[in-house]
């Protein structure tokens, strides 16, 4: 049986696809939010606390918002005024989901797709996360599995720009 290998370059879109306020891409303080799939309930609460704190700041949050935790964080963020960049691991939707239309219309949400794929899968999620890291100024990790794909991905990111919420006592999350 032959194993199919897909190069990251082959799934990257020739041109970034966007819906919403493209000026958000130029924001000077873009914090990425990523998390390993495995996360303790206590660390989930830290992520919610962080999202509540950051949602009314001038920072910009960039993430894939794909996992259930990340989707919850997006809901917290959209209740505030923080600009948000949602990065898809697939090509853009034909129709913007109902719950995202208002923030897009208000100019607070930019939806982008750096990949050319009809569906999200492991390789496109990896390409998406690489794009997020290349376009942020700092990184907040909800949790980090030292043996997971995310740990390998963030290994080259400057350590002094990473905050891992699982390592911080509850209530003391940095913005």
Q: Where are these predicted regions, by residue range?
A:
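Glycine-biased, small-residue-rich flexible motifs in mid-sequence functional cores and linkers
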Residues: 2-175
